[in-house]
Structures are given as C-alpha cells and as structure tokens.
Curated annotation (Swiss-Prot):
Compartment(s) where it occurs, according to its Swiss-Prot or TrEMBL record: Cytoplasm
Catalyzed reactions per annotation: (2R)-3-phosphoglycerate + ATP = (2R)-3-phospho-glyceroyl phosphate + ADP
UniProt xrefs under CDD domains: Phosphoglycerate_kinase
Pathway the protein contributes to: Carbohydrate degradation; glycolysis; pyruvate from D-glyceraldehyde 3-phosphate: step 2/5
GO-annotated cellular components: cytosol
Protein's organism: Streptomyces avermitilis (strain ATCC 31267 / DSM 46492 / JCM 5070 / NBRC 14893 / NCIMB 12804 / NRRL 8165 / MA-4680)
A GO molecular function held by the record: phosphoglycerate kinase activity
Keywords: ATP-binding, Cytoplasm, Glycolysis, Kinase, Nucleotide-binding, Transferase
Top-level taxonomy: Bacteria, Bacillati, Actinomycetota, Actinomycetes, Kitasatosporales
Subunit structure: Monomer.
Binding sites annotated in the UniProt record for substrate: D22, L23, N24, R37, H60, L61, G62, R63, R119, R156
Main location as per UniProt: cytoplasm
E.C. number(s) listed in UniProt: 2.7.2.3
Enzyme class: transferase
Name the UniProt record assigns to this protein: Phosphoglycerate kinase
Length: 403
C-alpha cells in the first residue's frame, strides 16, 4: 500500500488530488455535534495543500436515497473543515456536475474544495458494478491522483471507495495508514493479556467479531444492551431489557467455546434498571434502581452496568497489555446511565496497556463524557470498519489501495 509520504516525495504541485474522506458527522438541526471525523482527515488535507496540490475532498453523510436531500448536505462539514484549516474552502453544490467541475477548475495550487454528498448519486452505493463504475468514471474526471483517507467507509464496496482507486494512481492517507497499523497490533503479535470490552445495543452486530476473538483474546467483558442476551442465555430473567431471542443459541455456543478455549468471558453482576427508557432530550432524572444481574424485575429493563460490575470490569482491565473497546456499557447519553461507560473509559486511561477505542458510539462517548482523547492509545474513526477488520474480513477500500 503506497502512502501519502511517497506521493509527497514524488511531488503534487498543481495536481488535482481527490481525497476520499469520512466527513459523516452527526448533525442536530444542521449543526455538527461531534467534529472528530473532520479533525481526523486534517493532517492529510493540510499536507497536500501545503505541497501545492489542488485538493478535492469528497465524502458521504448519512443515508440519503441516491438523490439530493438538503438534510444530508455536506455544507456544514465543508464550513467546519475551512474553520479548522484556517483557510476558505470552496463548496460545490453537486458531486460530478457543472458545480463540481467549476469548483475544481477554480482551484489554485494549495486550495481546497469539497464536493457535495457522494450518496446524492445512486451510483455511489449501487450493487450494480457497471452503474458504480460509471459514477467512478465521472469522479475520476475531477482528479489526477486518488488518496483514500475515509477509514470509516473502507468496509463499503462503494464507487468512491472501491472503484475509483482503480482509475487513478492511488495512495493511503495518514489516517488510513495509522488505522491499519493500529489494527495490526490487535491481530498480529498481540501483547498479552489482551482484553476486549464490547458493548452497544445489538449482540447480532458483534457476533462475528466475538467469534474471531474467542481464538485471540484472553478476556472478554460484555456490557450494553447486548449483555441481556448473554444473561438470558445463562438462564437469568431479564425483564423488558433489550433481548435478541434468536441469538441465544449462538451466544450459548460462544459461552461454551470461551470456557473450552480458556477465554475468560465476564458478564455484568449487577445492573441499573427502570420501568422506562430515559428522556434523552430533557435529561429528566430517571431514578434507576440497582439490582443483581439475576434479579431483574419482570417490568423493568437494564440500562447500564451497576456499581459492582464497574469495579469488576476496572479490575479485569487493570493488568491488560492490550485493550480494544467497542460499544458503550449503557445509555451513556443520559447522566443517570453514563457511569458504566465512564468507568470503562477511565480504566483504559488508568491502564499501562496499548488502548484502542473502536470508533462509533464509544469514540463519541469518550468525547461527550469529557475525556482527554490523547489519554488513549488510539481512537478509531471507523466502528464498523474496525470490527470487520478484526473479524478477518477483506475490506474493499483497503484492498483497492493495495494494488
């Protein structure tokens, strides 16, 4: 995989460089609530601009239906990129139409343009190779060189991620190069004990990675909504907690395999419960009760790990040499259910281990709960991508940069 350093050594002065970034930031009423993904691509964009490239930044945002939708415009992301760069950024109101061509043609060396949301064109996400290829051809007309730096999208077989690199000289940006190096530390010659903390709502999202980790990790800590399927598989009643009944047989099989492989699988011993889901808008007090994990009342749902589990998980992380954490331990967006996630994050900060926070909600939680991001070994920008890498899958966007 050729990297941006090799590209810069070859020289980019006056060249049009297409940077596939991941600017898929969360928006509330048109305002960005977490700009982590924009910050993550800054080193690549800055280095190219400073070397005299005409930088064309492209990304998706949300899931528009293959047609323009103002709710998913990249304009707020383009404006924020300009603020962070401290330089004006041109914005094109289409992806491959006249506006995009005008914006790119108007660039002077060292300047940056952002084109509109790639998913406003059905060709970006099409399952049809020819349709995707046709869109990739139109994107290729905007540039001389391709730099892949949208790690959050490398697991998608989309035109700008998979098909476009084949049409231009292609390189990995700083972010992708860093992410791949970090993930290698979690898959090759891992320093032990290797402890993995998994949370989040759905156990089905994490089954494939648990399957792989049962052969690699020394210890698995389970929290979040997915924990209740494990507790149910253990024979406990879970009240009205989030439950994926259809996954119980698989979870049972994994629990047996963990025992056989000598992998320590740690489940919550107590949980915070309530009769209703908290109000995340008003953050009104939820007044949860703490109960033992095997004593959840029939009319209540578990919404965070309890104080004894927090202590237990912190102790299980304390002696680790390598930690991967993906998914919150509870409904961290509400102060009454944030302590579990906070405790795991704090245990990572206190640890001497190489710590990796696996993107998505966990990365957002670290920022929202006020942790210093530099206190972690690495905060990934790709939740789904990092999980699929750890599952041992070939990621289309990385494969496209290899050849």
């Amino acid at each position: 995989m050729k990297t941006i350093d090799e590209l810069l050594a070859e020289g980019v002065d006056g060249k049009r460089v297409f940077v596939r970034a991941d600017l898929n930031v969360p928006l509330a009423d048109g305002l960005i609530t977490d700009d982590g993904r924009i910050r993550a691509v800054l080193p690549t964009v800055k280095a190219l601009a400073e070397a005299g490239a005409k930088v064309v930044v492209a990304s998706h945002l949300g899931r528009p239906k293959g047609a323009p939708d103002p709710a998913f415009s990249l304009l707020p992301a383009a404006e924020r990129l300009g603020e962070l760069l401290g330089a004006p950024v041109a914005f094109a109101q289409d992806t491959v139409g006249p506006a995009a061509h005008d914006a790119v043609n108007g660039l002077q060396p060292g300047q940056v343009a952002v084109i509109e949301n790639l998913r406003f064109n059905a060709g970006e996400t099409s399952k049809d190779d020819a349709e995707r290829g046709a869109f990739a051809d139109r994107l290729a007309a905007l540039a001389d060189i391709y730099v892949g730096d949208g790690f959050g999208a490398v697991h998608r077989k989309h035109a700008s991620v998979y098909d476009l690199p084949a049409r231009l000289p292609h390189y990995a940006g700083y972010l992708i190069a860093t992410e791949v190096n970090v993930l290698k530390k979690l898959t090759e010659d891992v320093k032990r004990p290797y402890v993995v903390a998994l949370g989040g709502a759905k156990v089905s999202d994490k089954l494939a990675v648990i399957d792989q980790l049962l052969g690699k990790a020394d210890r698995l800590l389970i929290g979040g909504g997915m924990a209740y399927t494990f507790l149910k598989a253990k024979g406990y009643e879970v009240g009205i907690s989030l439950l994926q009944e259809d996954q119980i047989p698989t979870v049972k099989e994994y629990m047996e395999r963990a025992e056989k492989n000598g992998v320590e699988l740690v489940l919550p011993v107590d949980v915070l419960v309530s009769t209703e889901f908290p109000d995340l808008k008003t953050k009104a007090p939820a007044n949860p009760t703490t109960v033992a994990a095997d004593a959840i009342p029939a009319d209540q749902e578990g919404l965070d790990i309890g104080p004894e589990t927090r202590k237990l998980y912190a102790s299980k992380l304390a002696d680790a040499a390598t930690v991967f954490w993906n998914g919150p331990m509870g409904v961290f967006e509400h102060p009454d259910y944030a302590e579990g996630t906070k405790a795991v994050a704090q245990a990572l900060v206190d640890s001497q281990a190489f710590t990796v926070v696996g993107g998505g909600d966990s990365a957002a939680a670290v920022r929202i709960l006020g942790f210093d991001e530099t206190a972690f070994g690495h905060i990934s920008t790709g939740g789904g991508a990092s999980l699929e890498y750890l599952e041992g899958k070939t990621l289309p966007g990385l494969a496209a940069l290899e050849d």
